[in-house]
Amino acid sequence: MGPAALACRTHPAERSRQLATKKDSPATPRPSGGAGVHPADRHDLIRVEGARVNNLQDVTVDIPKRRLTVFTGVSGSGKTSLVFGTIAAESQRLINETYSSFVQGFMPSMARPDVDRLDGLTTAILVDQERMGANVRSTVGTVTDTNALLRILFSRLGQPHIGPPNAFSFNVASVRGAGAITVEKAGGKKVEKRTFERAGGMCTRCEGTGNVTDFDLNELYDASLSLNDGALRIPGYSMDGWYGRIFRGCGYFDPDKPIAKFTKRELDDLLHRDATKIKVEGINLTYQGLIPQIQKSFLSKDVEAMQPHVRAFVERVITFTACPDCDGTRLNERARSSRIDGVNIADACAMQISDLAEWLRGIEDPSVAPLLSGLQHTLDSFVQIGLGYLSLDRSSGSLSGGESQRTKMIRHLGSSLTDVTYVFDEPTIGMHPHDIARMNDLLLQLRDKGNTVLVVEHKPEVIEIADHVVDLGPGAGSEGGQVTYQGPVAGLAASDTVTGRHLGDKAAVKATTRDRTGVLEVRGATTNNLTGVDVDIPLGVLVVVTGVAGSGKSSLIHGSVSNRDGVVAVDQSPIKGSRRSNPATYTGLLEPVRKAFAKANGVKAALFSANSEGACATCNGAGVVYTDLAILAGVSTPCEDCEGRRFQAEVLDYRLGGLNIAEVLDLAVSDAVGFFAEGEARIPAAHKIAERLNDVGLGYLRLGQALTTLSGGERQRLKLATHLGGPGEVIVLDEPTTGLHLANVEHLLEMLDKLVDGGRSVIVIEHHQAVMAHADWIIDLGPGAGHDGGQIVFEGTPADLVAAATTLTGKHLAAYTA
């Protein structure tokens, strides 16, 4: 075989090394090491030995560098713990240690993962599913630096010329000043008048947020009560805490006087007073009126990123309307007056990104050629990655987890870095099968530049392009954490692992469908890109809403259905959970259990809470003691007094059904179902919640397991189980297969059938073909994304969709069920 043939069979990531080798002179002595191999070329593996993070059971695995490795396994098997919690975490920790101790003091401290040995690590770049931008000022344009490039472009080419790039920024306010200064010249002093002006683009009325707010004072407080009697209805504003001490000590009003009897001055001080220094109980504090305080503490965050109870308060009390001065563009009139070819910067940011890219191609000016090239590359990357339907003024907090992850990828697509480890967490989340091929091309591009690409993924389409596969299992939680297979994809398909058995799964289109019991009428829907959509959504059946990303699925369902009475919506927003939160506290299961313990033992229920009176005094109910080591990573050690059980010793003497409260919290969900079903420990309310957790496939979780240890898929199903207990007759689910293994999807379908057979209507927004094939009715939106979508392109049964095969969804479903 000739050299040309050998080159054709060489992996792309190895070609750069071969080129470098060819440049070596024959006279150049090679370092000792035998076999003519350069010592530096021996480090071709990332070696993990004895990993024990979360549920990993002394995992040892070798991962090839400069290859695409996909990590598979059922949800909760330990994939994220190995890739993110071990490999990526240690890489980032080692990089942080290269900075000076002064710089490290400003960086988050990271503990070393529980692993015996890690070799061959390179710089890790994490691209995860975390949503972006809790700040109300954060947009798609700001997080990708595209806005900055646009501002420079308009400052150079915009007519009329209004100033530097800051003049087009909605985060910079215009400032003007004047005064006299003393200037010393030639030994003499002279007073001169000087003025200065900083041009900013911020709209002064909405302060660059694009919205103005109107407060419903009746929802803010009960005017018939005094402050001391609990008039305030604001989350966290308790008179028992610091707010109460400030209100009582400020002297601006009488806290025992009903608010309805306040004078105009007192009411203004309560609601609108500017920040004022006061002294309360000998402590210097700042008093501020309720409305500016709420704007500062609540409205500085994006509504989508708020905790549920805070979000409910904001939606109840505050009405958001587009700013009348800037029409929601965030920019002042001066910034909007400068134009390029009739387009101002607000118009450009409001364009669909694919349209903006085309508009920029029409601008030809040698003076800004490098700027246009960089801007064009970024916008083309959006289109290439399947996000061309977004606009730069879209709030980053409104992006789904999948959209956020792909937006983060934009920064890396044009990077010239090589020998970097890229780590992705299910990059195909929220992607239609039609878009997955483009994502695969991007992953291969990163690999072919000589990078190591590690991907946690469930989709067969991504697994099939892998150079190497690591499968974890065999089960989830304590039943997982082991490497069940590692090697090429062909070997995985032939292996007897859960993933191997399901890799080639094909779904059969449902032969018989249920009959509808009624319809939900939607008429003239125009949310976002919807074009006056009229549709009747069947009730009493399983309805699946499909379409490419950006086609209008969420706009139709969340904009026209989710807010109706009797509808319970489970969206993709992440659940909030600290290291003290666990499935028992999050679902409300612990409350009836505490009451049952109290009743059985004749004591207070507060004793059976690790966050209240029953908490171990040494660790405050955390189960571990945290030691702060300043710039070094903090250390957590099991509490010696309670031995990690979180409760006082005397509390553990009280029993119910033969178990104390710590032992109950250590039960697996599947065991808890039986424990709460009969005997002394029979607690119907707790039994019902445990059953729901078991039904969504979380039977392996422990009731007291910290939420911070759960994977993304586990958290999604935990949230789903909580909402399933609601009173709604119609349940809306937004991509419930997120984070689910192929085997777990079967359990999800069984649960959906159980809901429908129980008399509920289920509407699912989904891309997974197995869910589509199982539907009673499909509503397909498209034909494309953004302004190319927003129309109903098909309504009917899965069999009819496959038979017609005229839409993108129909073609992919036909291929999946063939």
Model-derived segments and spans:
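Helix N-cap at the start of a conserved alpha-helix in ABC-type nucleotide-binding domains
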Residues: 432-437, 741-746
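Conserved catalytic segment of ABC-fold P-loop ATPases
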Residues: 452, 464-471, 754, 761, ...
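Walker B catalytic acidic pair
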Residues: 425-427, 734-736
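P-loop/Walker A nucleotide phosphate-binding surfaces of NTP-dependent enzymes
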Residues: 8, 14-398, 404-423, 442, ...
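C-terminal boundary and immediately downstream tail of ABC-type ATPase nucleotide-binding domains
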Residues: 152-156, 492-514, 595-599, 802-818
